[in-house]
Amino acid sequence: MGSAYKMLKNDKRCVRKHSKTIFLELFSISSSSSTQDKILQEIENLNADPFVHGIIVQMPLDSHEGIEINSHLVTNRIDPDKDVDSLTTINQGKVATGVLNSFIPCTPAGCLDLIKQSGVKLEGANAVVIGRSKIVGTPVTQLLKWNDATVTTCHSKTQNLKGIVSQADILVVAIGQPQFIPGSWIKTGAVVIDAGINFIPDSYKKSGK
């Protein structure tokens, strides 16, 4: 059984997992050189293509000639039945209300799997999520909540962050800032996941980071 997924990149791949083969066709629609209308039209074409089963828009979207592209409008144009990243309002609403038998955002789902594999008991656990983006922070909070953890979401306006973090049985950091949480804040035995994308100095890499 095969499934086809399309992403806004330039590549073609075939991924085999268990007994299924997933064909990935990645192609480029550069948001820095394409208008918003062109991107929306391409998504409509993919929505109508019966051979495409999933669509992922690679974020963030760049501006075009100084005009910002509305990422919410773009992602919300995807057919919810093909929205494998769960970025449409409909699919986000399902996750928010505990309807988890549809698409779950990949990174939040991966965080939940890692937490379960750690052996920590989710029911009643004190979970702290730092970050509230719709891509990671918010859906992680919702998934933990629907798995019966007691969840606190922290952000840039949160007071007494150290005190909150120090009580966490589970800590998920979903912000783009490295070394934001000192190790001294984290209690012994806590499960910690850094889901942020951070660039830090690395002398072993050609790029230096």
Language-model segments: which ranges?
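Short, high-confidence coil segments that cap the C-terminus of an alpha-helix
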Residues: F51-V52, A168
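Short, small-residue-enriched loops and turns at beta-alpha junctions
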Residues: S3-K6, S32-S34, D62-E65, F199
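Short beta->alpha junction loops
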Residues: L24-D37, S156-T158
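Short, well-structured alpha-helical segments in soluble
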Residues: K38-P50
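Cationic, amphipathic, low-complexity alpha-helical segments enriched
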Residues: M7-L8, V15, T21-I22, L26-I29, ...
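Glycine-rich phosphate/diphosphate-binding loop of Rossmann-like nucleotide-binding domains
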Residues: G2-K17, G93, V99-A195, I200-K209
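Short glycine-centered, acidic/aromatic-flanked micro-motifs in structured strand/loop junctions
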Residues: M1, I29, V57-M59
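Anion-binding alpha/beta catalytic cores of soluble intermediary-metabolism enzymes, centered on
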Residues: H53-N126
